[in-house]
Design a protein with these regions (language model features):
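Transmembrane helical bundles of ABC transporter permease domains
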Residues: 283-324
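Conserved amphipathic alpha-helical "coupling/scaffold" segments
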Residues: 1-231, 294-300, 305, 327-329, ...
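Short amphipathic alpha-helical segments with heptad-repeat character
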Residues: 275, 289, 293-296, 300-303, ...
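Transmembrane-cytosolic junction motif
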Residues: 1-11, 273-293
Length: 553
Protein backbone atom coordinates (compact mmCIF):
# COMPACT_ATOMS: atom_id res chain seq x y z
CA UNK A 1 0.00 0.00 0.00
CA UNK A 2 1.23 3.49 -0.82
CA UNK A 3 2.02 6.07 1.81
CA UNK A 4 -0.90 8.48 2.04
CA UNK A 5 1.38 11.44 2.64
CA UNK A 6 3.24 12.63 -0.47
CA UNK A 7 6.65 14.16 0.01
CA UNK A 8 8.50 16.63 -2.20
CA UNK A 9 5.26 17.35 -4.06
CA UNK A 10 5.86 18.98 -7.44
CA UNK A 11 3.50 20.78 -9.82
CA UNK A 12 3.21 18.08 -12.47
CA UNK A 13 -0.36 18.81 -13.58
CA UNK A 14 -1.22 20.66 -16.76
CA UNK A 15 -4.56 22.33 -17.28
CA UNK A 16 -7.08 21.76 -18.48
CA UNK A 17 -7.28 18.03 -17.84
CA UNK A 18 -7.68 15.86 -20.93
CA UNK A 19 -10.90 14.31 -19.62
CA UNK A 20 -13.45 16.76 -21.00
CA UNK A 21 -16.19 18.22 -18.81
CA UNK A 22 -18.37 18.71 -21.90
CA UNK A 23 -20.71 16.27 -23.58
CA UNK A 24 -18.15 14.98 -26.08
CA UNK A 25 -15.18 12.73 -25.41
CA UNK A 26 -12.03 14.49 -26.60
CA UNK A 27 -10.01 12.83 -29.36
CA UNK A 28 -6.45 11.61 -28.82
CA UNK A 29 -5.09 14.26 -31.20
CA UNK A 30 -7.33 17.14 -30.14
CA UNK A 31 -4.45 18.94 -28.39
CA UNK A 32 -2.63 19.76 -31.63
CA UNK A 33 -1.84 23.47 -32.01
CA UNK A 34 -4.42 25.75 -33.61
CA UNK A 35 -3.98 29.18 -35.17
CA UNK A 36 -5.67 30.80 -32.18
CA UNK A 37 -4.18 28.46 -29.57
CA UNK A 38 -0.45 27.80 -29.88
CA UNK A 39 2.26 26.89 -27.43
CA UNK A 40 5.87 25.90 -27.98
CA UNK A 41 4.93 24.81 -31.52
CA UNK A 42 2.85 26.77 -33.99
CA UNK A 43 0.70 25.07 -36.62
CA UNK A 44 3.23 25.37 -39.46
CA UNK A 45 6.09 24.04 -37.34
CA UNK A 46 3.94 21.21 -36.01
CA UNK A 47 3.29 20.04 -39.57
CA UNK A 48 6.76 20.75 -40.96
CA UNK A 49 8.59 18.63 -38.37
CA UNK A 50 6.20 15.67 -38.82
CA UNK A 51 4.93 15.64 -35.25
CA UNK A 52 2.11 13.21 -36.04
CA UNK A 53 4.56 10.76 -37.56
CA UNK A 54 6.82 11.14 -34.51
CA UNK A 55 3.89 10.29 -32.25
CA UNK A 56 3.12 7.19 -34.32
CA UNK A 57 6.75 6.14 -34.04
CA UNK A 58 7.12 6.42 -30.25
CA UNK A 59 3.56 5.57 -29.19
CA UNK A 60 3.43 2.36 -27.14
CA UNK A 61 0.67 3.50 -24.77
CA UNK A 62 -2.17 1.03 -24.20
CA UNK A 63 -4.90 3.25 -22.77
CA UNK A 64 -6.82 6.00 -24.54
CA UNK A 65 -5.82 8.46 -21.83
CA UNK A 66 -2.17 7.36 -22.06
CA UNK A 67 -2.07 8.02 -25.81
CA UNK A 68 -3.76 11.38 -25.27
CA UNK A 69 -1.18 12.40 -22.65
CA UNK A 70 1.72 11.31 -24.87
CA UNK A 71 0.30 13.18 -27.86
CA UNK A 72 -0.12 16.32 -25.74
CA UNK A 73 3.51 16.05 -24.60
CA UNK A 74 4.59 16.24 -28.26
CA UNK A 75 2.01 18.70 -29.57
CA UNK A 76 2.27 21.02 -26.56
CA UNK A 77 5.62 20.27 -24.94
CA UNK A 78 6.47 21.78 -21.59
CA UNK A 79 9.55 23.97 -21.15
CA UNK A 80 9.64 23.50 -17.37
CA UNK A 81 13.12 22.09 -16.72
CA UNK A 82 12.29 20.91 -13.19
CA UNK A 83 9.25 18.97 -14.35
CA UNK A 84 11.27 17.27 -17.10
CA UNK A 85 13.97 16.35 -14.58
CA UNK A 86 11.37 14.76 -12.28
CA UNK A 87 9.85 12.87 -15.20
CA UNK A 88 13.28 11.53 -16.13
CA UNK A 89 13.80 10.46 -12.53
CA UNK A 90 10.68 8.31 -12.83
CA UNK A 91 11.91 6.79 -16.11
CA UNK A 92 15.23 5.90 -14.48
CA UNK A 93 13.36 4.24 -11.63
CA UNK A 94 11.42 2.13 -14.13
CA UNK A 95 14.67 1.08 -15.79
CA UNK A 96 16.36 0.27 -12.46
CA UNK A 97 13.43 -1.51 -10.79
CA UNK A 98 12.06 -4.41 -12.89
CA UNK A 99 9.57 -5.37 -10.16
CA UNK A 100 8.02 -1.90 -10.15
CA UNK A 101 7.98 -1.83 -13.94
CA UNK A 102 6.15 -5.18 -14.01
CA UNK A 103 3.66 -4.01 -11.36
CA UNK A 104 2.84 -0.84 -13.29
CA UNK A 105 2.47 -2.84 -16.51
CA UNK A 106 -0.03 -5.17 -14.82
CA UNK A 107 -1.86 -2.18 -13.39
CA UNK A 108 -2.23 -0.50 -16.79
CA UNK A 109 -3.33 -3.74 -18.47
CA UNK A 110 -6.01 -4.22 -15.80
CA UNK A 111 -7.27 -0.69 -16.37
CA UNK A 112 -7.36 -1.06 -20.17
CA UNK A 113 -10.14 -3.63 -19.90
CA UNK A 114 -12.56 -1.23 -18.21
CA UNK A 115 -11.36 2.19 -19.36
CA UNK A 116 -13.83 2.39 -22.23
CA UNK A 117 -16.76 1.77 -19.90
CA UNK A 118 -15.95 4.95 -17.96
CA UNK A 119 -16.13 7.03 -21.13
CA UNK A 120 -19.40 5.33 -22.10
CA UNK A 121 -20.81 6.38 -18.73
CA UNK A 122 -19.50 9.96 -18.91
CA UNK A 123 -20.35 10.71 -22.54
CA UNK A 124 -23.02 8.20 -23.50
CA UNK A 125 -26.47 9.13 -24.80
CA UNK A 126 -29.18 6.59 -24.01
CA UNK A 127 -32.20 6.20 -26.26
CA UNK A 128 -34.28 3.73 -24.26
CA UNK A 129 -35.58 0.41 -25.53
CA UNK A 130 -33.35 -2.65 -25.65
CA UNK A 131 -29.95 -2.17 -24.04
CA UNK A 132 -26.78 -2.28 -26.18
CA UNK A 133 -23.21 -2.71 -24.96
CA UNK A 134 -21.48 -0.83 -27.78
CA UNK A 135 -22.27 2.60 -29.23
CA UNK A 136 -23.79 2.90 -32.69
CA UNK A 137 -20.93 5.14 -33.86
CA UNK A 138 -17.72 5.54 -31.87
CA UNK A 139 -16.42 8.40 -34.03
CA UNK A 140 -19.16 10.86 -33.13
CA UNK A 141 -21.83 10.59 -30.45
CA UNK A 142 -21.72 7.60 -28.12
CA UNK A 143 -25.35 6.52 -28.55
CA UNK A 144 -26.68 3.41 -26.83
CA UNK A 145 -29.93 1.57 -26.57
CA UNK A 146 -31.30 1.20 -23.06
CA UNK A 147 -31.33 3.51 -20.07
CA UNK A 148 -27.64 3.57 -19.11
CA UNK A 149 -27.83 1.05 -16.26
CA UNK A 150 -25.20 -1.26 -17.74
CA UNK A 151 -22.83 1.63 -18.50
CA UNK A 152 -23.39 3.07 -15.02
CA UNK A 153 -22.47 -0.22 -13.35
CA UNK A 154 -19.36 -0.83 -15.48
CA UNK A 155 -18.19 2.79 -15.50
CA UNK A 156 -18.42 3.25 -11.74
CA UNK A 157 -16.75 -0.13 -11.19
CA UNK A 158 -13.79 1.07 -13.27
CA UNK A 159 -13.39 4.07 -10.95
CA UNK A 160 -13.54 1.83 -7.88
CA UNK A 161 -11.00 -0.59 -9.40
CA UNK A 162 -8.69 2.31 -10.30
CA UNK A 163 -8.46 3.40 -6.67
CA UNK A 164 -8.12 -0.11 -5.24
CA UNK A 165 -5.46 -1.21 -7.73
CA UNK A 166 -3.49 2.03 -7.32
CA UNK A 167 -3.53 1.62 -3.55
CA UNK A 168 -2.10 -1.89 -3.96
CA UNK A 169 0.91 -0.77 -6.02
CA UNK A 170 4.35 -1.19 -4.43
CA UNK A 171 6.13 1.82 -2.90
CA UNK A 172 7.94 4.10 -5.32
CA UNK A 173 11.02 6.28 -4.91
CA UNK A 174 10.58 9.03 -7.50
CA UNK A 175 8.46 12.05 -6.59
CA UNK A 176 6.78 12.05 -10.03
CA UNK A 177 5.45 8.50 -9.74
CA UNK A 178 4.56 8.99 -6.09
CA UNK A 179 2.41 12.00 -6.92
CA UNK A 180 0.63 10.17 -9.75
CA UNK A 181 -0.23 7.18 -7.61
CA UNK A 182 -1.26 9.38 -4.71
CA UNK A 183 -3.68 11.31 -6.93
CA UNK A 184 -5.51 8.07 -7.73
CA UNK A 185 -5.55 6.98 -4.10
CA UNK A 186 -6.78 10.42 -2.98
CA UNK A 187 -9.65 10.18 -5.43
CA UNK A 188 -10.95 7.45 -3.14
CA UNK A 189 -11.54 10.10 -0.46
CA UNK A 190 -13.64 12.33 -2.70
CA UNK A 191 -17.42 12.72 -2.76
CA UNK A 192 -17.43 11.74 -6.44
CA UNK A 193 -15.84 8.42 -5.54
CA UNK A 194 -18.36 7.87 -2.72
CA UNK A 195 -21.20 8.34 -5.21
CA UNK A 196 -19.56 6.05 -7.76
CA UNK A 197 -18.90 3.44 -5.11
CA UNK A 198 -22.44 3.70 -3.78
CA UNK A 199 -24.93 3.44 -2.31
CA UNK A 200 -26.66 6.56 -3.67
CA UNK A 201 -29.78 8.05 -2.10
CA UNK A 202 -32.00 10.61 -3.80
CA UNK A 203 -33.55 13.01 -1.28
CA UNK A 204 -35.53 16.03 -2.48
CA UNK A 205 -33.89 15.76 -5.90
CA UNK A 206 -30.36 15.76 -4.45
CA UNK A 207 -27.85 12.92 -4.32
CA UNK A 208 -26.62 11.76 -0.95
CA UNK A 209 -23.90 9.31 -0.02
CA UNK A 210 -24.34 6.86 2.84
CA UNK A 211 -22.52 9.30 5.14
CA UNK A 212 -24.68 12.23 4.06
CA UNK A 213 -28.04 10.47 4.37
CA UNK A 214 -29.86 11.08 7.67
CA UNK A 215 -29.38 7.91 9.65
CA UNK A 216 -33.00 7.14 10.48
CA UNK A 217 -34.61 8.47 7.29
CA UNK A 218 -36.18 5.51 5.42
CA UNK A 219 -35.09 6.33 1.85
CA UNK A 220 -34.52 3.59 -0.74
CA UNK A 221 -31.13 3.53 -2.44
CA UNK A 222 -30.79 4.01 -6.20
CA UNK A 223 -30.48 0.67 -7.96
CA UNK A 224 -29.21 0.76 -11.57
CA UNK A 225 -31.62 -1.89 -12.80
CA UNK A 226 -34.91 -2.09 -14.67
CA UNK A 227 -36.32 -4.29 -11.94
CA UNK A 228 -37.35 -2.10 -9.04
CA UNK A 229 -38.57 -4.35 -6.27
CA UNK A 230 -40.40 -1.70 -4.28
CA UNK A 231 -42.51 -0.33 -7.19
CA UNK A 232 -43.14 -3.88 -8.40
CA UNK A 233 -44.20 -4.96 -4.92
CA UNK A 234 -46.55 -1.98 -4.61
CA UNK A 235 -48.03 -2.66 -8.05
CA UNK A 236 -48.51 -6.37 -7.30
CA UNK A 237 -50.12 -5.52 -3.98
CA UNK A 238 -52.58 -3.14 -5.64
CA UNK A 239 -53.42 -5.63 -8.40
CA UNK A 240 -53.82 -8.44 -5.87
CA UNK A 241 -56.11 -6.28 -3.75
CA UNK A 242 -58.23 -5.40 -6.77
CA UNK A 243 -58.30 -9.01 -7.83
CA UNK A 244 -59.53 -10.29 -4.48
CA UNK A 245 -61.98 -7.41 -4.17
CA UNK A 246 -63.60 -8.05 -7.52
CA UNK A 247 -63.29 -11.80 -7.14
CA UNK A 248 -65.27 -11.75 -3.89
CA UNK A 249 -67.76 -9.15 -5.10
CA UNK A 250 -68.55 -10.92 -8.35
CA UNK A 251 -68.54 -14.34 -6.68
CA UNK A 252 -71.78 -13.39 -4.97
CA UNK A 253 -73.24 -12.83 -8.44
CA UNK A 254 -71.71 -16.05 -9.78
CA UNK A 255 -69.33 -14.18 -12.16
CA UNK A 256 -65.90 -15.26 -10.81
CA UNK A 257 -64.22 -15.00 -14.21
CA UNK A 258 -64.36 -11.19 -14.01
CA UNK A 259 -61.51 -11.15 -11.49
CA UNK A 260 -59.32 -13.23 -13.77
CA UNK A 261 -60.11 -10.89 -16.65
CA UNK A 262 -59.01 -7.87 -14.65
CA UNK A 263 -55.81 -9.69 -13.67
CA UNK A 264 -55.04 -10.50 -17.32
CA UNK A 265 -55.68 -6.90 -18.39
CA UNK A 266 -53.21 -5.55 -15.83
CA UNK A 267 -50.31 -7.77 -16.96
CA UNK A 268 -49.47 -5.63 -20.08
CA UNK A 269 -49.23 -2.60 -17.80
CA UNK A 270 -46.12 -3.99 -16.10
CA UNK A 271 -43.61 -3.20 -18.92
CA UNK A 272 -45.25 0.21 -19.42
CA UNK A 273 -44.77 1.03 -15.75
CA UNK A 274 -41.19 -0.28 -15.78
CA UNK A 275 -40.40 1.81 -18.86
CA UNK A 276 -41.77 4.90 -17.15
CA UNK A 277 -39.65 4.19 -14.07
CA UNK A 278 -36.52 3.64 -16.19
CA UNK A 279 -37.11 6.86 -18.14
CA UNK A 280 -37.44 8.67 -14.83
CA UNK A 281 -34.17 7.13 -13.62
CA UNK A 282 -32.41 8.25 -16.79
CA UNK A 283 -33.59 11.86 -16.59
CA UNK A 284 -33.46 12.36 -12.84
CA UNK A 285 -30.50 10.16 -11.82
CA UNK A 286 -28.27 8.84 -14.62
CA UNK A 287 -27.89 12.06 -16.63
CA UNK A 288 -27.46 14.35 -13.58
CA UNK A 289 -24.85 11.98 -12.13
CA UNK A 290 -23.16 11.78 -15.53
CA UNK A 291 -22.82 15.57 -15.56
CA UNK A 292 -21.60 15.62 -11.96
CA UNK A 293 -18.94 12.98 -12.70
CA UNK A 294 -17.76 14.80 -15.86
CA UNK A 295 -17.21 18.01 -13.91
CA UNK A 296 -15.29 16.30 -11.09
CA UNK A 297 -11.66 17.54 -11.03
CA UNK A 298 -10.75 14.66 -8.71
CA UNK A 299 -11.92 12.07 -11.27
CA UNK A 300 -10.22 13.91 -14.15
CA UNK A 301 -6.98 14.07 -12.15
CA UNK A 302 -7.11 10.38 -11.25
CA UNK A 303 -7.73 9.33 -14.86
CA UNK A 304 -4.95 11.64 -16.07
CA UNK A 305 -2.61 10.02 -13.55
CA UNK A 306 -3.32 6.66 -15.16
CA UNK A 307 -2.50 8.20 -18.54
CA UNK A 308 0.74 9.73 -17.30
CA UNK A 309 1.89 6.36 -15.94
CA UNK A 310 1.01 4.76 -19.28
CA UNK A 311 2.99 7.52 -21.02
CA UNK A 312 6.07 6.72 -18.92
CA UNK A 313 5.78 3.05 -19.88
CA UNK A 314 5.41 4.04 -23.53
CA UNK A 315 8.58 6.16 -23.45
CA UNK A 316 10.41 3.29 -21.75
CA UNK A 317 9.24 0.75 -24.34
CA UNK A 318 10.12 3.04 -27.24
CA UNK A 319 13.70 3.29 -25.99
CA UNK A 320 13.92 -0.51 -25.76
CA UNK A 321 12.58 -0.96 -29.31
CA UNK A 322 15.35 1.03 -31.02
CA UNK A 323 18.68 -0.60 -31.83
CA UNK A 324 21.72 1.42 -30.92
CA UNK A 325 22.31 3.93 -28.19
CA UNK A 326 19.42 5.74 -26.50
CA UNK A 327 19.92 8.31 -23.78
CA UNK A 328 17.98 10.56 -21.46
CA UNK A 329 19.19 14.11 -22.17
CA UNK A 330 20.62 16.15 -19.35
CA UNK A 331 18.03 18.88 -18.78
CA UNK A 332 19.41 22.30 -17.86
CA UNK A 333 17.56 25.33 -16.54
CA UNK A 334 19.03 28.44 -18.16
CA UNK A 335 18.02 31.74 -19.68
CA UNK A 336 19.24 30.84 -23.16
CA UNK A 337 18.50 27.79 -25.28
CA UNK A 338 21.20 25.26 -26.07
CA UNK A 339 21.33 21.74 -27.51
CA UNK A 340 24.39 19.51 -27.58
CA UNK A 341 24.12 15.93 -28.86
CA UNK A 342 26.70 13.26 -29.66
CA UNK A 343 25.94 10.74 -32.42
CA UNK A 344 22.42 12.02 -33.02
CA UNK A 345 20.17 9.87 -35.20
CA UNK A 346 16.81 10.83 -36.64
CA UNK A 347 14.00 9.59 -34.34
CA UNK A 348 11.78 8.64 -37.30
CA UNK A 349 14.52 6.61 -38.99
CA UNK A 350 16.66 5.25 -36.15
CA UNK A 351 14.53 2.14 -35.59
CA UNK A 352 13.96 1.20 -39.25
CA UNK A 353 17.47 2.19 -40.43
CA UNK A 354 20.03 0.74 -37.98
CA UNK A 355 22.83 1.96 -40.29
CA UNK A 356 21.61 5.56 -40.18
CA UNK A 357 24.60 7.94 -40.35
CA UNK A 358 24.80 9.81 -37.01
CA UNK A 359 25.88 13.42 -36.64
CA UNK A 360 26.84 15.61 -33.73
CA UNK A 361 24.79 18.68 -32.81
CA UNK A 362 26.41 21.65 -31.12
CA UNK A 363 24.15 24.63 -30.55
CA UNK A 364 25.51 26.59 -27.61
CA UNK A 365 26.55 30.13 -26.75
CA UNK A 366 29.49 29.96 -29.17
CA UNK A 367 27.40 28.40 -31.94
CA UNK A 368 24.15 30.30 -31.70
CA UNK A 369 23.89 30.93 -35.45
CA UNK A 370 24.49 27.84 -37.59
CA UNK A 371 24.44 27.96 -41.40
CA UNK A 372 24.32 24.68 -43.33
CA UNK A 373 25.29 24.39 -46.97
CA UNK A 374 25.71 21.46 -49.31
CA UNK A 375 24.37 19.56 -52.29
CA UNK A 376 20.74 18.77 -52.86
CA UNK A 377 19.60 15.47 -51.32
CA UNK A 378 22.71 15.47 -49.16
CA UNK A 379 20.95 15.37 -45.80
CA UNK A 380 20.60 19.03 -44.80
CA UNK A 381 16.84 18.86 -44.20
CA UNK A 382 17.13 15.49 -42.44
CA UNK A 383 19.76 17.00 -40.12
CA UNK A 384 17.51 19.95 -39.29
CA UNK A 385 14.54 17.70 -38.60
CA UNK A 386 16.75 15.53 -36.43
CA UNK A 387 17.65 18.61 -34.37
CA UNK A 388 14.03 19.63 -33.87
CA UNK A 389 12.70 16.13 -33.25
CA UNK A 390 15.40 15.39 -30.67
CA UNK A 391 14.62 18.71 -28.97
CA UNK A 392 10.94 17.75 -28.97
CA UNK A 393 11.57 14.25 -27.59
CA UNK A 394 13.78 15.77 -24.92
CA UNK A 395 10.93 18.08 -23.93
CA UNK A 396 8.61 15.10 -23.46
CA UNK A 397 11.05 13.96 -20.78
CA UNK A 398 11.86 10.86 -22.81
CA UNK A 399 14.81 9.16 -24.46
CA UNK A 400 16.53 10.34 -27.65
CA UNK A 401 18.54 8.28 -30.18
CA UNK A 402 22.06 9.44 -29.35
CA UNK A 403 25.11 8.61 -27.24
CA UNK A 404 24.79 11.70 -25.08
CA UNK A 405 22.60 14.79 -25.05
CA UNK A 406 22.24 17.99 -23.10
CA UNK A 407 19.56 20.63 -23.67
CA UNK A 408 17.85 23.70 -22.34
CA UNK A 409 14.09 23.45 -23.01
CA UNK A 410 12.91 25.84 -25.72
CA UNK A 411 9.89 28.01 -25.02
CA UNK A 412 9.32 28.41 -28.79
CA UNK A 413 10.32 26.20 -31.72
CA UNK A 414 9.94 27.59 -35.23
CA UNK A 415 10.56 25.75 -38.49
CA UNK A 416 10.04 27.75 -41.68
CA UNK A 417 9.87 25.91 -45.00
CA UNK A 418 9.33 27.33 -48.51
CA UNK A 419 5.66 27.81 -49.36
CA UNK A 420 3.80 29.13 -52.40
CA UNK A 421 2.13 32.53 -52.23
CA UNK A 422 -1.39 33.06 -50.96
CA UNK A 423 -3.88 34.42 -53.51
CA UNK A 424 -6.42 35.13 -50.79
CA UNK A 425 -3.88 37.38 -49.05
CA UNK A 426 -2.86 39.09 -52.28
CA UNK A 427 0.84 38.25 -51.93
CA UNK A 428 3.37 36.17 -53.81
CA UNK A 429 5.92 33.69 -52.51
CA UNK A 430 8.51 36.29 -51.48
CA UNK A 431 6.06 38.41 -49.49
CA UNK A 432 4.45 35.34 -47.93
CA UNK A 433 7.76 33.88 -46.74
CA UNK A 434 9.00 37.27 -45.55
CA UNK A 435 5.81 37.67 -43.52
CA UNK A 436 6.45 34.27 -41.90
CA UNK A 437 10.04 35.23 -41.08
CA UNK A 438 8.83 38.51 -39.60
CA UNK A 439 6.34 36.69 -37.33
CA UNK A 440 9.03 34.28 -36.20
CA UNK A 441 11.50 37.08 -35.46
CA UNK A 442 9.12 39.19 -33.40
CA UNK A 443 8.03 36.15 -31.37
CA UNK A 444 11.53 34.78 -30.73
CA UNK A 445 13.47 35.04 -27.48
CA UNK A 446 16.85 33.73 -26.29
CA UNK A 447 14.95 30.54 -25.37
CA UNK A 448 13.76 29.97 -28.95
CA UNK A 449 14.96 27.42 -31.51
CA UNK A 450 14.54 28.73 -35.08
CA UNK A 451 15.19 26.82 -38.31
CA UNK A 452 14.92 28.61 -41.65
CA UNK A 453 14.97 26.44 -44.76
CA UNK A 454 16.20 29.07 -47.24
CA UNK A 455 15.65 32.79 -46.73
CA UNK A 456 14.51 35.64 -48.97
CA UNK A 457 13.91 33.48 -52.03
CA UNK A 458 12.03 34.97 -54.98
CA UNK A 459 13.95 38.22 -55.36
CA UNK A 460 17.18 39.45 -56.95
CA UNK A 461 20.55 38.22 -55.72
CA UNK A 462 21.55 41.63 -54.39
CA UNK A 463 18.30 42.13 -52.49
CA UNK A 464 18.44 38.59 -51.12
CA UNK A 465 21.97 39.16 -49.83
CA UNK A 466 21.04 42.44 -48.12
CA UNK A 467 17.84 41.15 -46.57
CA UNK A 468 19.32 37.79 -45.45
CA UNK A 469 22.28 39.53 -43.86
CA UNK A 470 20.31 41.92 -41.65
CA UNK A 471 17.74 39.25 -40.73
CA UNK A 472 20.40 36.76 -39.62
CA UNK A 473 22.30 39.45 -37.74
CA UNK A 474 19.02 40.34 -36.04
CA UNK A 475 18.45 36.75 -34.90
CA UNK A 476 22.08 36.58 -33.75
CA UNK A 477 21.73 39.73 -31.64
CA UNK A 478 18.37 38.53 -30.33
CA UNK A 479 20.10 35.46 -28.88
CA UNK A 480 17.78 32.85 -30.37
CA UNK A 481 19.33 29.59 -31.56
CA UNK A 482 19.06 30.01 -35.34
CA UNK A 483 19.82 27.56 -38.15
CA UNK A 484 19.73 28.51 -41.82
CA UNK A 485 19.80 26.00 -44.68
CA UNK A 486 21.02 27.70 -47.84
CA UNK A 487 22.95 27.41 -51.11
CA UNK A 488 24.05 31.04 -50.80
CA UNK A 489 27.77 30.61 -50.09
CA UNK A 490 28.38 34.32 -50.74
CA UNK A 491 26.20 35.15 -47.72
CA UNK A 492 28.17 32.66 -45.61
CA UNK A 493 31.49 34.18 -46.62
CA UNK A 494 30.27 37.70 -45.83
CA UNK A 495 29.04 36.76 -42.33
CA UNK A 496 32.05 34.54 -41.67
CA UNK A 497 34.32 37.45 -42.52
CA UNK A 498 32.69 39.39 -39.68
CA UNK A 499 33.12 36.49 -37.26
CA UNK A 500 29.39 35.75 -37.14
CA UNK A 501 28.05 32.21 -37.13
CA UNK A 502 29.37 28.66 -37.43
CA UNK A 503 29.22 26.65 -40.65
CA UNK A 504 28.58 23.04 -41.61
CA UNK A 505 28.51 21.45 -45.02
CA UNK A 506 27.47 18.06 -46.31
CA UNK A 507 30.47 15.79 -46.81
CA UNK A 508 30.64 14.82 -50.47
CA UNK A 509 32.77 12.03 -51.95
CA UNK A 510 33.18 11.14 -55.63
CA UNK A 511 30.51 8.45 -55.27
CA UNK A 512 28.06 10.87 -53.67
CA UNK A 513 27.11 12.50 -50.34
CA UNK A 514 27.89 10.63 -47.11
CA UNK A 515 25.07 12.40 -45.19
CA UNK A 516 27.67 13.44 -42.65
CA UNK A 517 27.97 17.12 -41.68
CA UNK A 518 31.49 18.53 -41.49
CA UNK A 519 32.80 22.07 -40.80
CA UNK A 520 33.00 24.38 -43.79
CA UNK A 521 31.06 26.13 -46.53
CA UNK A 522 29.99 24.29 -49.67
CA UNK A 523 30.32 26.15 -52.98
CA UNK A 524 28.57 23.55 -55.15
CA UNK A 525 25.10 22.03 -55.09
CA UNK A 526 25.64 19.07 -57.47
CA UNK A 527 22.26 19.73 -59.03
CA UNK A 528 23.37 17.75 -62.10
CA UNK A 529 23.64 14.57 -60.00
CA UNK A 530 20.12 15.02 -58.65
CA UNK A 531 18.75 15.72 -62.13
CA UNK A 532 20.47 12.62 -63.52
CA UNK A 533 19.16 10.46 -60.69
CA UNK A 534 15.65 11.68 -61.45
CA UNK A 535 16.02 11.12 -65.20
CA UNK A 536 15.87 14.83 -66.00
CA UNK A 537 19.43 15.70 -67.02
CA UNK A 538 20.37 17.67 -70.12
CA UNK A 539 20.82 14.41 -72.00
CA UNK A 540 17.36 13.17 -70.88
CA UNK A 541 15.74 16.35 -72.18
CA UNK A 542 17.55 16.07 -75.53
CA UNK A 543 16.61 12.39 -75.90
CA UNK A 544 12.95 13.17 -75.24
CA UNK A 545 12.91 15.99 -77.79
CA UNK A 546 14.52 13.71 -80.35
CA UNK A 547 11.65 11.22 -80.04
CA UNK A 548 8.94 13.77 -80.78
CA UNK A 549 7.35 13.75 -84.27
CA UNK A 550 9.13 16.08 -86.67
CA UNK A 551 12.12 16.48 -84.35
CA UNK A 552 14.15 13.49 -85.48
CA UNK A 553 17.15 14.45 -87.68
Amino acid sequence: MNDATPSNSIPIWRGPFILSDGKRLAGIRDTRPAEADQGVLDVKTFNAIETDALFDEINRAETWIGQSVLYRSLARPTHDAQLLQKKQEALRELADNPELHAALERFVKQMVAGEESLYYLLYGEFNGGLATDDPKNKTEKLEFGGYGYHQFIDGTQFAVDLVEEADALPPVRSAYLRELIQAMVDFGNSRTYALMHGPIYVIDGKFKTSKEKPRYLPVPRFRPSMFKWLPILIFVSIVSGLYFFFQNMWAELGETYIGYGILILTVPMIPIILQAICSSDLKSVIYPLQKLFRKSPELAKAVESLGMIDELLSLHHYAKSVEGEMTLPEILAAGQHSLTVTNARNPLLARIQPDYVPNDIKLDAANRLLIITGPNSGGKTAYCKTIVQIQLLGQTGGYVPASHARLVPAEHIFYQVPEPGRLDEGMGRFAHELKQTREIFFNSTPLSLVILDELAEGTTFEERMTLSEYVLKGFHQLGATTILVTHNHELCERLSGEGIGSYLQVEFLPEGPTHRLIPGISHVSHADRVASALGFSKEDVEKHLATLPGKAE
